[in-house]
Amino acid sequence: MYVRRLELVDFRSYERVGVDLEPGANVLVGHNGVGKTNLIEALGYVATLDSHRVATDAPLVRMGAGAAVIRCAVVHEGRELLIELEIVPGRANRARLGRSPARRARDVLGALRLVLFAPEDLELVRGDPAERRRYLDDLLVLRQPRYAGVRADYERVVRQRNALLRTAYLARKTGGTRGGDLSTLAVWDDHLARHGAELLAGRLDLVAALAPHVTRAYDAVAAGTGAAGIAYRPSVELPTPTTDRADLTAALSAALAAGRSAEIERGTTLVGPHRDDLTLTLGPLPAKGYASHGESWSLALALRLAGYDLLRVDGIEPVLVLDDVFAELDTGRRDRLAQLVGDASQLLVTCAVEEDVPARLRGARFVVRGGEVHRA
C-alpha cells in the first residue's frame, strides 16, 4: 500500500497544496515550522479520523476558512482509490470513497493503513493512561476497522450514563428531587457491560499479539539496554485471563453493581475500558517514572514499530511515517532503525537536516518551504 498523491485545501497552514509521492522512501526536508508535519498529520487523519497533535478538529482548518479538505489517492494491490474528507468544525465530517459519498466519515477507515511516529509519542510512555488507550484503539481499528463502531458505541453509552449520574449527583447535592431518578441506570449498565466487553476483548487480544513485537522492536532499536514489556491493566477484576465476551460482560456487570454507590456519589462512570491502562516496563521497573529520556523515546518508537510489524504479520502493508525522528537518535540507533524500516512499501520521513537521515533511506526528496512542496 502507498499514497500516490496528497492534496490539501485550507488545511492548517496550507491554502492549497498537492504532492505526488513515490513507493519506498520519501524524505520531506524543511526548516522547523514550515509545514512538514501538517502534511503527514493530514495523512494520519485519513487513517484514524484523529489528529496526533490536537484533541479537536478546529485547529486543522486554516484561519479564516470554513472547512478543510484532504484528498489522497491510495494504491493497494494495483488498484487506486481516491479518499476525500471535508472537515467542518462543529459538524460531522463528510467523506467520499472513489466517486461515492460515504454514509459516515468512519466508513473510510481501513482504506489507508498508516502507522505514524512523532515526537508527541513520548506521551505514550510519560503521559496519562488516555494516551495509551488511544494508541491501542487506533491500532485495533487499523487491524479491524469494525472496532471503530464498537468504540463509538461504547463512548456514546459512557456519555449517556455520565449525564444520568451527573444529573442525579447535582439533584442530591442541592437537596432537590427533580433529575434524581436513576430508574434507567440499570439499562445503561447493561449497555455499558455489553459494549465494554466487546472493546475489552479486542484490546486484550491485541495486547497478547502485540507484546512479543514490542520486546523485539525495543531490543532492535536500543540494542541490549534491557527488555521491554507490555501488559493490559483493566479497571475490573477478571477471574482468569479471558477474552470470552460473556465472561467479560459478567465481570463488568459485577463491577458496576459493586461500584454504584461510589459512582452516584461522584456523578461519573468509574468502571469500564475507558478507565483501563497499558502498563509499560523496562526490565523489572515501570517505564513511567523510571525510564530516562532516551529509553522513553526508544520505547515509544518500539510501540509504533511493533504495531507496524503486527499489521504486516496480518498481511497488511501499511504506510510508515517517521516525523522528525532521526534528530533524536545517535548514529547507532539511526542505522538500526534504518535497517528495520528500509523495506517498507512506503516510508515518509520528515527532517530539518537531511544528513540526519541514513543514506539508505534517502529516496524521493521533497523540499517544504513557504507553503509549497517541491520535488528536489
Swiss-Prot record:
It comes from the Bacteria. One of its GO terms (molecular function) is single-stranded DNA binding. The keyword Membrane does not apply. One of its GO terms (cellular component) is cytoplasm. Transmembrane segments: none annotated. PROSITE patterns: RECF_1, RECF_2. The keyword DNA damage applies. The RecF protein is involved in DNA metabolism; it is required for DNA replication and normal SOS inducibility. RecF binds preferentially to single-stranded, linear DNA. It also seems to bind ATP. This is DNA replication and repair protein RecF. The lineage of its organism: Bacteria, Bacillati, Actinomycetota, Actinomycetes, Micromonosporales. The gene is recF.
